[in-house]
Every structure is written in structure tokens, then in C-alpha cells.
């Protein structure tokens, strides 16, 4: 049984029952593995026990193609995207010292979606990987702008305001692409992309996303110690020798890479980066450094569950992943905002 440590604290403060980090990560890996197995076994095409056995014994058989060429890559991409969003959200919440921050606060998601919309409207969807590369390029441009700003300004409020402006600009330009698109087919494709999905993803999509996600994860991990010191206050952290400019660049660049790779792989998916850190915050003693990897695992678990729900909910047309996360994430966001307002009043 995992060793639990009871801590006292006021409700909503992020304090309570804490678990050792290795055991927490192990428990979440086991839970993610179990959910992934269920997600691979369930789908639109039901299989019998004999067909499951055939798929295990002969991966090239028709049941094997369903399991290993269609469902397994889809689950893998969902897990990678969820992990990237969860880690990015935890990093942003630690850097901005705001539990309501998420990866979209930098504007990277909006500009990345704009890149994908431009690629689709220009007819580049026929080229393999063109949409993904355009989305990642948009994320890198937005990330570079935010990194430059993070290196120049000390106030986290300036970073938030710039991210809001960048999101508004990206959204406006995407709407302009809709307005000027000469083809209703291209417009429908852009809309489908912006709603987010891991449908029809394969192992190559996972490999494309893995490189920028790995670099982003390394940068966020290197920023972990600085995020922990930042909880003491920016002035105290600076007096302790923490290089604030380097910390901001590492955290922002890592978060931008993670978010951009996630959007490139699955489209725009909201609320995962916001919700994942809150699922495990009380179990890591509200420590930003200890929060990073459990948040990544929680994000992977959330998105695999959301994709499973999108597949098994009986509808004429499969639900988009971004729709499912928004339906469940919006009430969660409202609850977090309500709890935060109570703590501010107290």
C-alpha cells in the first residue's frame, strides 16, 4: 500500500494527504496502463474473445490490424498529447504562481491552430505531415515571441497580458481564414482540426510529436527547482541566487514546445492542462517541482479516458476530443474559480 502522510491545512489550500512521489507515479502509471488496455480493447468495431486471441497471436490478421494499427496508435497519441498538456499546465501554474493558468495562457495554442488553418486553406493537406508542421511552426513563432518577452520583463502579469493578446490575435486571424476560405470543404476541415481529435492517428504521428515533446519536457524539468524556489516569492528567490530570466525562458520555451507539439498532433484541446495539475496537487504537498511528472501522467490518463468516452458514447458521428474535454472541463474550471474566489476573500 502507498505510504500516506497526513498534513493539516485549510480547505482548498492544496494541503492534505501527501504521497511519496515514486509511489504516486507508480500508481498513476498502473492506472494509465489499465485504462490504455481497456481503450485498445473497446471501440466501434466489437471483437470476440477468439478475435482478441487471433490479434495477439497474429498481429497482421484483420483483428490484429484493428488493435495494433488503429486503436493502439490512437491511444498512444492521446497519452502523449495529454502528458504534454498536463506537464505544460503544471509548469505555467508554477511560473505564474496562479492555479488557474493553463497552456493556452501563452497564446501558443491559438497561433498553432492558425498555422494548421492556413495550411488546410492553402490546400497543403494533401502533403503528408504538412498540417502538423504548420501547426508546430506557428507554435514555435508564438513561443519565440513569448520567450523574448519573458526574458525582458519581470512581472508575470505582463506575460499573461501578452498571452491574452496573442490568443486574441490568433483567434481573429483564424476567423479571417474561415471568412476568406474559398472552399466549404476546407472550412469544414479547419473546423474539425480546431475541435481536436486523435482519430486516424498512427505511429508516425506519435514519432513526429515525440521529439519536440521530449525537448520541452527536459526544459520544464530543468525549471523545476526554480519553480519550487519561486513559491517563496520572486524577491526572495532572486536574493537566493535564482536566475529569474533563465527560469522564465526555460519554463516558457518548454511549455511552448509541449503545447505546440500537442496541437500539431491532435488539434486544439482545452482544459486538460488546467485540470491535470489539480488532480494531484494535494498529493505532492503543493510543491511545483514534485507536481510536474504526476501532472503529466494525470494529463495522459485524462485524455485517454476522454478519447475512450468519445468513441463509446453512442452518437451518429464520433464526438471530437476537444468537445468532450470542454464539456467536462468547463464545470471543473468554474468550480476552481469559485474555490479560488473564496480563498481570495478569506
Residue ranges and their predicted role:
Residues 2-346:
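Alpha-helical transmembrane segments in inner-membrane proteins
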Amino acid at each position: 500500500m502507498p505510504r500516506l502522510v497526513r498534513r493539516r491545512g485549510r480547505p482548498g489550500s492544496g494541503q492534505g494527504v501527501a504521497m511519496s512521489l515514486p509511489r504516486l507515479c507508480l500508481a498513476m502509471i498502473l492506472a494509465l496502463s489499465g485504462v490504455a488496455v481497456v481503450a485498445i480493447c473497446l471501440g466501434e468495431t466489437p471483437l470476440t474473445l477468439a478475435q482478441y486471441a487471433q490479434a495477439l497471436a497474429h498481429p497482421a490478421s484483420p483483428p490484429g490490424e484493428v488493435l495494433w494499427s488503429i486503436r493502439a496508435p490512437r491511444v498512444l497519441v492521446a497519452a502523449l498529447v495529454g502528458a504534454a498538456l498536463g506537464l505544460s499546465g503544471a509548469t505555467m501554474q508554477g511560473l505564474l504562481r496562479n492555479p488557474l493558468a493553463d497552456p493556452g495562457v501563452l497564446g501558443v495554442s491559438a497561433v498553432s491552430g492558425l498555422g494548421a488553418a492556413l495550411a488546410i486553406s492553402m490546400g497543403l493537406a494533401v502533403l503528408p505531415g504538412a498540417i502538423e508542421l504548420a501547426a508546430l511552426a506557428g507554435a514555435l513563432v508564438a513561443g519565440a515571441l513569448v520567450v523574448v518577452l519573458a526574458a525582458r520583463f519581470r512581472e508575470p502579469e505582463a506575460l499573461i497580458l501578452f498571452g491574452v493578446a496573442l490568443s486574441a490575435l490568433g483567434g481573429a486571424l483564424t476567423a479571417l481564414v474561415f471568412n476568406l476560405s474559398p472552399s466549404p470543404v476546407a472550412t469544414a476541415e479547419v473546423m474539425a482540426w480546431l475541435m481536436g481529435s486523435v482519430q486516424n492517428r498512427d505511429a508516425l504521428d506519435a514519432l513526429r510529436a515525440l521529439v519536440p515533446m521530449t525537448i520541452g519536457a527536459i526544459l520544464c524539468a530543468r525549471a523545476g527547482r526554480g519553480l519550487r524556489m519561486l513559491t517563496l516569492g520572486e524577491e526572495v528567490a532572486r536574493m537566493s541566487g535564482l536566475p529569474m530570466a533563465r527560469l522564465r525562458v526555460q519554463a516558457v520555451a518548454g511549455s511552448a514546445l509541449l503545447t505546440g507539439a500537442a496541437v500539431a498532433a491532435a488539434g486544439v484541446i482545452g482544459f486538460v492542462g488546467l485540470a491535470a495539475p489539480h488532480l494531484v496537487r494535494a498529493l505532492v504537498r503543493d510543491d511545483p517541482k514534485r507536481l510536474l511528472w504526476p501532472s503529466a501522467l494525470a494529463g495522459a490518463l485524462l485524455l485517454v479516458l476522454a478519447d475512450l468516452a468519445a468513441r463509446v458514447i453512442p452518437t451518429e458521428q464520433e464526438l471530437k476530443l476537444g468537445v468532450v474535454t470542454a464539456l467536462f472541463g468547463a464545470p471543473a474550471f468554474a468550480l476552481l474559480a469559485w474555490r479560488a474566489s473564496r480563498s481570495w476573500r478569506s
